[in-house]
Each structure stands twice: as structure tokens, then as C-alpha cells.
Amino acid sequence: MNIVALHVVLYQPEIPANTGNIARTCAATNTTLHLIRPLGFSTDDKMLKRAGLDYWEFVNVVYHDSLEELFEAYKKGKFFFITKFGQQPHTSFDYTDLDEDYFFVFGRETSGLPKDLIQNNMDRCLRLPMTEHVRSLNLSNTAAILVYEALRQQNYRDLK
């Protein structure tokens, strides 16, 4: 039996505190963090370090120069694209196959994912339900919700 691998992918993140908070979630859950360049901040940023606290040594961070580079490196990965344009809620998908690597791909805080990526992958676009008067949820909160939904479906494998 394999351990299910979870991955959070941040496409050109802009806010260091969000990335730091997501890194902390990744450290707590053995989830790999992928950062797609260019980043909107320096990896030496004080807010990034503070949000991640002293857990950075426990985070597996992988840098990519493009989404295409990521897709090429993980051809067998199962990619899900998080967008308010998704037709299905995050709970509609099954994350329990022990032979899969699950990638949750998030867009920039201000503009989301590239439109053509969304249009070409609508069957794998998911959304978090929310009221009409809210434009979006915070990126780090959304990432945590997705990671913990996958872990819930896996009965919180290897977590105490």
C-alpha cells in the first residue's frame, strides 16, 4: 500500500503571508508545495518567513518556471484546478486512490488561473461553495480546506 501524495501548487503567488500559511499547512500534513515562478515576493521576505514560522525545514518546496514544466515533470499526476468558475464542488471528487499523486492548483490572488487552462480542463475544475456576495475566499484558507478534504477521505493517513 502506497502513501497517497498530496501537492499544493501556487501559480505565481503574490502575497507572501498566504504562501507562508500554506507552507505551514503543508508541513503539518506532509504535502509538497510547488511554487510556479515568477513569485510576487522574495523567498527571503519577512512576512513569508513569519507566516511559515519555524516549520520551513519540514516543507518540501519545489520551484517551477512554468505550469508546463510542472505538468511535464509529473505526467502521471492527477491535477485539479481551483477556480470560482468550477462547475463541481471540491467534495464531488474522489482523492482516495493510493496509486495517485493529487495536485491542487491555485491561481494568483488577484487574477486566478490562466483562462485557457480553465477552459481546457473544466472537468477537473472545482470550486468551494459560498454565498453570491463574496467574490473569493482567502487563498491559504482554501488550500487548507482542499488538503484536509483529501486527508479526510483518506482517514487522515499518517496524521495524529
Curated annotation (Swiss-Prot):
It is found in: Cytoplasm. One of its GO terms (molecular function) is RNA binding. GO terms for biological process: wobble position ribose methylation. Gene3D superfamilies: 3.40.1280.10. It catalyses: cytidine(34) in tRNA + S-adenosyl-L-methionine = 2'-O-methylcytidine(34) in tRNA + S-adenosyl-L-homocysteine + H(+); 5-carboxymethylaminomethyluridine(34) in tRNA(Leu) + S-adenosyl-L-methionine = 5-carboxymethylaminomethyl-2'-O-methyluridine(34) in tRNA(Leu) + S-adenosyl-L-homocysteine + H(+). Its EC number is 2.1.1.207. This is Putative tRNA (cytidine(34)-2'-O)-methyltransferase.
